């Protein structure tokens, strides 16, 4: 609820302010081309296709290909990143303090600006969240889920995919070294499941 409230307030405050022709305009143009049935990279110059399909999906659902519909789609992605970020912060906090959580949420949102950075920062937070999820309890499902997040991250940016792979491999090595008796899943099987998740996430 806090995430949705703050993202809505920030959107009402800044949602109709400013326009970056190169960054935001490039994304807007790409999303419109996707709505016309074109494919990013193949049919028009673009970054990785994930962000265009995300924006185009919501623009289609809204029945609007305007700039405000694009910004709403980006704000929704921002909300996901802020929610996961707050979850990680709260998980690491010894005491749940509403003022601390509120301050953390505001800092997270300010850190994400300008608007075209929402994707990149949110994806980084999601990758960190998936690794926390894996470290907390390295089960088969969590290995696969961690790989799935890396694969999806690569759809939004090859650099994010690369960072996710490096972070995941480092985490799996650490889990292998610090393996506890309760962790019955072998390293090889965990790597296989993670790899399957990466392929599945990147497949679209």
State each model region's role.
Residues 67, 71, 102-125, 151, ...:
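Aromatic- and kink-enriched transmembrane "portal" helix at the membrane-lumen/periplasm boundary
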Residues 127-145, 153, 177-182:
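Membrane-interface transmembrane helices that cradle and orient dolichyl/undecaprenyl
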Residues 72-95, 133:
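Transmembrane-helix motifs of polytopic, lipid-linked glycan transferases
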Residues 1-7, 183-204:
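Hydrophobic alpha-helical membrane-interfacial segments at the cytosolic entry of transmembrane helices
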Residues 108-109, 143-158, 164-169, 198-201:
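Membrane-interface alpha helices of multi-pass inner-membrane proteins
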Residues 15-30, 41-57, 64-68:
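Extracytoplasmic catalytic/substrate-binding loops of multi-pass membrane glycan-assembly enzymes
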Residues 19-20, 97-100, 116-124, 141-142, ...:
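Short, aromatic-rich membrane-interface segments at the entry and exit
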Residues 27, 78-82, 120-132, 145, ...:
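Hydrophobic core segments of transmembrane alpha-helices in multi-pass, intramembrane catalytic enzymes
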């Amino acid at each position: 609820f806090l995430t949705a409230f703050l993202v809505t307030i920030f959107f009402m405050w800044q949602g109709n302010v400013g326009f970056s022709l190169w960054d935001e305009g490039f994304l807007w143009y790409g999303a419109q081309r996707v709505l016309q049935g074109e494919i990013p990279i193949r049919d028009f110059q673009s970054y990785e296709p994930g962000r265009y399909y995300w924006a185009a999906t919501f623009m289609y659902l809204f029945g609007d290909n305007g700039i405000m519909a694009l910004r709403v789609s980006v704000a929704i992605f921002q909300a996901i990143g802020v929610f996961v970020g707050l979850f990680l912060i709260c998980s690491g906090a010894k005491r749940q303090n509403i003022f601390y959580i509120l301050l953390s949420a505001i800092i997270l949102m300010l850190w994400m600006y300008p608007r075209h950075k929402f994707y990149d920062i949110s994806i980084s937070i999601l990758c960190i969240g998936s690794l926390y999820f894996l470290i907390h309890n390295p089960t088969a499902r969590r290995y696969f889920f961690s790989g799935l997040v890396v694969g999806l991250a690569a759809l939004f940016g090859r650099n994010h995919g690369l960072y996710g792979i490096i972070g995941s491999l480092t985490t799996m090595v650490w889990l292998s070294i610090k393996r506890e008796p309760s962790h019955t899943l072998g390293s090889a099987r965990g790597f296989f499941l993670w790899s399957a998740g990466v392929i599945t996430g990147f497949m679209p």
